[in-house]
Structure formats: structure tokens, C-alpha cells
Amino acid sequence: MAFELPKLPYPANALEPHIDEATMNIHHGKHHNTYVTKLNAALEGHSALAEKSIEALVSDLDAVPENIRTAVRNNGGGHANHTLFWQILSPNGGGAPTGELADAINAEFGSFDQFKEKFADAAANRFGSGWAWLVVNDGKLEITSTPNQDTPLMEGKTPILGLDVWEHAYYLNYQNRRPDYISAFWNVVNWDEVAKRYNEAK
């Protein structure tokens, strides 16, 4: 079964002014769609791999034949990362986490503000293209970043919050001001979705 581009869970203009409609249309409809198209092309003739979930596929790249492994890593990673990204954003987002996730963030990072600072540092200091992540690793929260379209799933970690810092994610609106984009991100984080993923992963 071929992988498919998921629909956005909100209109393309719903995250404005923090993430603009033009960026969303290009980012989702062009960039993410291209990852899906190229992933399906790479997996032609490999039906057993194509039937896996995207998470299972990128979690076990050693099972992917060497001649298509790079294509699956890049495009499968891009599909997995963006599928999560759209879900953890919301026009009704922002604020702060509550419940067990809030307790875990405070225990691991000292406070929500300290967590945001460390996460923003990971995003701002990721050289070139990549992602910043909040992951669950052996039941504990960690902040990490990955290059290109690599996903923490490739390292056995479960991402629950991700920020795309490829220039295509922000350049139309923010140009070279990546820190401004990172600051705007906090206004649209869907903490209910992040908490759900935390509870499933811990």
C-alpha cells in the first residue's frame, strides 16, 4: 500500500500570523508531498516494506536494501517528521502543558521557561537544515536535534514535539530570522496532542 499525504487538520491559513498561509501551502502541498511521492517511488517492488507504518519503516533502516536506503531515510524521514509536525500544531495552541507532561518537563528541565529556552537553543543552533525535538527515551524526556530529515525514531527515541528549521518552513515570512520563527512556534503548539504522545511513549 502506498504512503499518502495526510490532510492538514486545520485550514492552511489557520496558524496565521505565526505561520503564514503561503508557507503552509508550499510546505505541506509541495515539500511534504514530494517526500511521499519519492518514498513511494523508492519502495516500488518492495511490497513488504511499503506495507509497514512509516514509524516502523524509518525505525529499522537496516531492513531496507542498501540501494534504496538513502532515499527511504531522506523521504521516509521527511514524511514521518512532517506528519507529526502538522499534528502538534493548532490554531488553538500555545499556552503551557498541564498534568503529567508539565510535571515531567519541570522535573527534567527545571521549569517550562527553562525547557523553552533549551529547546529554542537546539533549534537555533542546528546548523543548516534539520529539526529540534522533544523526545521520550527510556521513559525520560530529552531535547535533541537531527540533521536533514533524520528522525529520532532512527535512534530508538520517540518524538513527541518537533520544530522544522529547514528554511522552507519559515523563509517566506521570516527570511533569515530563525529565532523569530522559533518564538512564534510556541503560540501554535498543540500541547494536548504532545501530552497524548507523551502518555503513549513513556
Swiss-Prot record:
Belongs to the iron/manganese superoxide dismutase family. It catalyses: 2 superoxide + 2 H(+) = H2O2 + O2. This is Superoxide dismutase [Mn]. Mn(2+) binds at H27, H82, D164, H168. It comes from Halalkalibacterium halodurans (strain ATCC BAA-125 / DSM 18197 / FERM 7344 / JCM 9153 / C-125) (Bacillus halodurans). Binds 1 Mn(2+) ion per subunit. GO terms for cellular component: cytoplasm. The gene is sodA. Its EC number is 1.15.1.1. The lineage of its organism: Bacteria, Bacillati, Bacillota, Bacilli, Bacillales. InterPro entries: Mn/Fe_SOD, Mn/Fe_SOD_BS, Mn/Fe_SOD_C, Mn/Fe_SOD_N, Mn/Fe_SOD_N_sf, SOD_C_sf.
